[in-house]
Amino acid sequence: MPDSAPILQVENVFAGYVKDLDILQGVNFRVEPGELVAVIGPNGAGKSTLAKTIFGLLTPHSGSILFQGQNIAGFKSDAIVQQGMCYVPQIANVFRSLTVEENLEMGAFVLDQPIQALKDEIFTRFPKLAERRKQRAGTLSGGERQMLAMGRALMLKPSLLLLDEPSAALSPILVNSVFEQIREINRQGTAIVLVEQNARKALEMADRGYVLEAGKDRFEGRGSDLLNDPKVGELYLGAAKAH
């Protein structure tokens, strides 16, 4: 990646859901402009906690989170959205009672401008959503809901997209489709943090990756290097290798 200031820099962050009980224990993490960075690790490692802390759903107990040069630690999520970061959670990531089109409109809630062109861009990117634009989101398949959640986030043209377990509960075919969309979003210049349980697939597409364990960043490196690291493979990729 080019030599430039990181778009996101997490420095020595401690965070958790209860005061004095830290799940994240001194995590350091960075994303360069335009990078796709994977965050992998076993269940309970703190991956989703890291995503929620970055996006302001949890306030870090200590440490800093610099986004585009500004310390956003302690900011509310709506303020972080306006700074240019969007988040797609693992579950409850669409408004099931609203139509596909209404979901996209909800994604543009902070914009004071016409949004039809933005919706058209999303429908061009996700043709299946265009076909179902008047259907309620609750009637969509799991893969279609994931595409809708990403599409809603992209309505704001974020500088950084934070994805929490986008492959969760999807069939292998749908996983491939969703991951190809993630690749394409990144190719077009959006930096992506991919928090993902499917470690092998995440590292295959990542510029760099981090391995979390027990709330600490145990390994960091290029995605290809982590894939080929015997220790990472033994500890975290064994199940994936068996398939």
Predicted regions and their residues:
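ABC-type ATPase nucleotide-binding domains, specifically the catalytic core motifs of the NBD
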Residues: 18-19, 100-117, 125-127, 237-241
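ABC ATPase C-loop
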Residues: 153-154
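The feature captures the beta-strand-to-loop junction immediately N-terminal to the Walker
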Residues: 40-42
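Conserved catalytic motifs of ABC-family nucleotide-binding domains
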Residues: 157
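Catalytic Walker B motif of ABC-type/P-loop ATPase nucleotide-binding domains
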Residues: 161-165
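A short, flexible loop at the N-terminus of ABC-type nucleotide-binding domains that lies
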Residues: 2-10, 14-26, 33, 57, ...
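Conserved ABC transporter NBD signature motif
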Residues: 63-71, 83, 115-117, 121-124, ...
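Conserved ABC ATPase signature
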Residues: 136-140, 144
